[in-house]
């Protein structure tokens, strides 16, 4: 079911300019698939869909290009090789890297499109990530630690 839904989503966004999850859910329903907004939201994450500016000047869902996917994988590798420690203080995540690597590691974090990140800033060897809640910060730390096998 999920595979056929994912296939249909990719077909829909390639044929039409879909701007919202609600529009996508409606298109799926028109094709005979019963979906909720939560399901569509998960599908968008799993398919790693992004929003791009359409020729009409509005944002629409699109697939990530192979080049961007390749770059994202490279950044994750760089992250795993340069991060020394990931810690949390309240709703702030602190990532320590080897000297000169914080910007590349921060770019890797950005490429993950993690939910709940309000913003981040990178220095030479430290990244501060402001999350929207302590629970979100905890989840971010867990995900980042998995990436460095900690």
From Swiss-Prot:
A Pfam cross-reference name: Arg_repressor_C
The keyword Repressor appears for this protein: yes
Recorded metabolic or biological pathway in which this protein acts: Amino-acid biosynthesis; L-arginine biosynthesis [regulation]
Keywords from the UniProt entry: Amino-acid biosynthesis, Arginine biosynthesis, Cytoplasm, DNA-binding, Repressor, Transcription, Transcription regulation
Molecular functions per Gene Ontology: arginine binding; DNA binding; DNA-binding transcription factor activity
Gene3D superfamilies: 3.30.1360.40, Winged helix-like DNA-binding domain superfamily/Winged helix DNA-binding domain
GO-annotated biological processes: L-arginine biosynthetic process; protein complex oligomerization; regulation of arginine biosynthetic process
GO cellular component: cytoplasm
Location within or outside the cell: Cytoplasm
Family, as annotated: Belongs to the ArgR family.
Role, per record: Regulates arginine biosynthesis genes.
Protein name listed in UniProt: Arginine repressor
Source species taxonomy: Bacteria, Bacillati, Bacillota, Clostridia, Eubacteriales
């Amino acid at each position: 079911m999920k595979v056929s839904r994912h296939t249909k989503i990719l077909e829909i966004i390639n044929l039409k300019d879909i701007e919202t999850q609600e529009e996508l859910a409606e298109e799926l329903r028109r094709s005979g698939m019963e979906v909720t907004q939560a399901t569509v939201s998960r599908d968008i994450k799993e398919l790693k869909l992004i929003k791009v500016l359409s020729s009409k000047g509005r944002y629409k869902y699109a697939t990530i290009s192979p080049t961007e996917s390749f770059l994202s994988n490279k950044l994750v590798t760089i992250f795993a090789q340069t991060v020394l420690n990931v810690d949390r203080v309240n709703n702030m995540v602190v990532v320590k890297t080897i000297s000169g690597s914080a910007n590349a590691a921060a770019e890797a974090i950005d490429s993950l499109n993690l939910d709940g990140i309000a913003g981040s800033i990178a220095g030479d060897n430290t990244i501060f990530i402001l999350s929207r809640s302590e629970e979100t910060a905890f989840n971010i730390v867990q995900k980042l630690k998995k990436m460095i096998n900690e």
